[in-house]
Regions:
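Two-component system phosphorelay core
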Residues: 1-140
C-alpha cells in the first residue's frame, strides 16, 4: 500500500462485537472503553452518545474538506476522530483515522481506498453504537 499503513482488518479478530457475535471482529471494544472511565457505565454511555453525534458532523465536514482539497482540515478532523475513537475503544476506526491523518503529510499519494476504508469503518462504528445504546444499561 502506498501509505505504508494497513487498512485491512488485523490478522486475528479483536474479539466479539457488542452484539455478541463471536465471528464478527470487534468494531469498538466496550471493555477498553470502560477501562478508560474506571468502569463507570453511565459515564461511558454518555461519552459514546456524544461520540456518535460528533461523528456525524465530523464525517460530513471531512467530506467537504476532501472535496475542497483542504488537506490541513482533513488532517485536523482525522486527528479529532482518532482521539475520540481511542476514547471509546474503536481501535479500527482509530487506526483508519491515523492512516488518513498520516496521508495528509503527502496528500498527492492519498488513495481513494484509504478514504473509503475510513468511511466504511466510521459507518460500522455508528451502527454498532446504535446497537450498544439500544441495550439496557448493565448489558454491555
Amino acid at each position: 500500500e502506498t501509505l505504508g499503513v494497513h487498512s485491512e482488518s488485523p490478522a486475528r479478530p479483536l474479539g466479539q462485537s457488542v452484539r455478541g457475535d463471536s465471528a464478527a471482529p470487534k468494531v469498538f471494544d466496550t471493555v477498553a472503553g470502560l477501562r478508560r472511565v474506571d468502569g463507570d457505565v453511565s459515564l461511558y454511555r454518555k461519552i459514546v452518545r456524544l461520540f456518535s453525534k460528533e461523528m456525524v458532523d465530523d464525517g460530513e465536514q471531512l467530506k467537504v474538506h476532501l472535496l475542497h482539497r483542504d488537506w490541513k482540515q482533513v488532517a485536523d478532523t482525522a486527528h479529532k476522530v482518532k482521539g475520540s475513537a481511542s476514547t471509546i475503544g474503536a481501535q479500527r476506526l482509530e487506526a483508519e483515522a491515523k492512516g488518513l491523518q498520516q496521508a495528509m503529510k503527502s496528500p498527492e499519494t492519498l488513495r481513494e481506498d484509504r478514504v473509503d476504508a475510513f468511511f466504511r469503518e466510521l459507518s460500522a462504528v455508528q451502527e454498532e453504537i446504535s446497537h450498544f445504546l439500544d441495550l439496557p444499561e448493565g448489558h454491555q
